[in-house]
Amino acid sequence: MNMILTFGTVVLGIVAFIVVLGIIILVHEGGHFLFARKYGILCREFSFGMGPQLVHHKKGETDYSIRAFPIGGFCAIAGEEAEDNPLKDSKQVRLVIENGIIQKICFEIDSKLFKDIPLFDLKEYDLFDKEDTGKLYMTVVDANGGEMTLPVDKAASYLFHSKMYKKQEIKDSKTYKKYAKEFQIAPHNRTLNAKKKGQRVMVMVGGPMMNFILAIIVFFLSALIGGVSNTTVTTLSEVSNGTPAYEAGLREDYELESFTFRGNEYTLENWEDISSTIDKYAEGNDYVDIVIKYTDAAGEEQTTSLKPMVAIYSVSMYQDINSDEVKVAELDSSSKAYKAGVRTGDIITKVNGEDVSTWLDVYHSFEQVTDEGVSVTMDVTRDGESVDDISVIPYSKDLFEKTQAVSYVDLIIGISPSVTHNLWKSLGDGFTKMYTSIKSMIFTLGLLIGSNEVGVKDLSGPVGIFSMTSSAAQRGIAYLLYWLGFLSVNIGFINLLPIPALDGGRILFVIIEAIRKKAVSEKAQTIAINVTYYALLALIVYVTFNDVLRIVK
């Protein structure tokens, strides 16, 4: 049974990963495609997936395709990369001429696939028309020695055979269609670089812009399905098993009325009251019960009590609520606490040389460590023996609270506010989450550049994203939609960075051109793009390797 569940979880993760990344990349490339089409730029192919084509359908001048590997996709925009000249070293060509106008140009003259197409000696040609005269032509000599200059259709195509072709004899049109491929020529006025600076920028911005729009939509849908927190009342949503609140008997739809501790009763009218009262509890030193007065789902007034659970998020260390000792709950091997030498089941006896008798003492000790690079020393008892001087460096308060949306140290009861399903609140939540996601990305980027706390080793690659997507899928459609939106914001933001291989780099080239009054040379652009592309590829390999190591450990 467990094997079936595990298999089902893996399949769910794979499907969710493909769907989530597929949607994000399809929307991103769709943004480029829409603006390119708007400005009259040739888009030869719009593809979902990478690798060999599985199916395709040509509509107009664009080939819409689905490829073998459903990760990624692309929009082939003419002029985005340097255009190759297939006729560069050609002395002969085969031409399909209709009504005196060249429609197809074949440079693979020895291929049996095209042996029935007339062969010409090539004298001169212009298929680019850099001056935008509107005239494309080829001067050729036929088999009888007659020289002629023929116009070339602006939508003419190069003919070539697919990689699958093995020099077979072509016996019917079906076989020809299977192996013959076409590649439409791109006159200068149909290429990206021929367009105005603002138009070029919009084509590049189009992808990230669509990612941001997608994020707002899915954040909105996530809030509409999962609900928006209703913090104006003290009614509870689902209470998670294993939390202090659950163990104390609190359940969904119960309404909290008051907290009492250390001789004081605090009336609760909204969620802000709950938060501020927990803050008051944290200010004290004695780890006492909180007596909670509440109204249950049947409308009966009840009383229960609990001790908040301590979470030291800055090192990912948590209280074992099933023990009366200062016992550490199960640790993740990737946590700072584990890497420093703390283990599940350790009983903490000292922090920074001071005796601790409760988890609230531990809370206060770590609460004081707010700055980057400050170490905390712990003594623990493990299996009856002392293990002293375990040194751990927590994440700073600033880093943690700006990137994780939770406090670096916290007292957890295990409750959350009830939710409301409201159209306008959900829409507002979509924009709010979009803003906070971008703000988090900007702050994280700043940390990568100017902080020692976060480095390349902390980034996640495809394997890490797969793992997190799988976890999101298991939490339900609302959370998966939120995760899709968060990833979409990330991809949109990253693509706007001024790195030549990314959209932001192409925008940077346009800005440099506007300042210099002269375009960056194609050669310089190509070198910069290739160098940064391979650097990014190396980075992906490195973070993927780290992802795998984390999973193995």
Model-identified regions with their sequence ranges:
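Functional transmembrane alpha-helices
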Residues: 2-4, 175-198, 313-339, 344-347, ...
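Conserved PDZ fold ligand-binding element
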Residues: 246-272, 339-360, 528
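Juxtamembrane transmembrane-helix termini
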Residues: 35, 226-229, 261-264, 450, ...
